[in-house]
């Protein structure tokens, strides 16, 4: 992975951890699988503790921290509560792909 992408991943991880009580942060998609192209965005899945605030509100909090860094990153971010992630990772779902093929950036 090149230095710019690693820098972006570090910034994303730092912003997520400042904004929300993440249990885990996964990188998935083309960057995780080593197949990015010029159209690729960074795909992130954030696992949150059960009982945390509304996911839409937390998503906004994370984006606010990224904006404070004055950095524009082409990012596709998904958030899910721990119990939902753990239940869905056993079926034919995005969570299964993330759990099986994703790269853990934080947690677990």
Model feature map: region roles:
Residues 42-47:
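Short beta-strand->loop micro-motif that forms the acidic, two-metal-ion catalytic signature
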Residues 28-30:
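Glycine-rich beta-strand-to-loop/alpha-helix junction loops that act as flexible
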Residues 1-24, 33-38, 49-108:
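Catalytic core of pol beta-like nucleotidyltransferases
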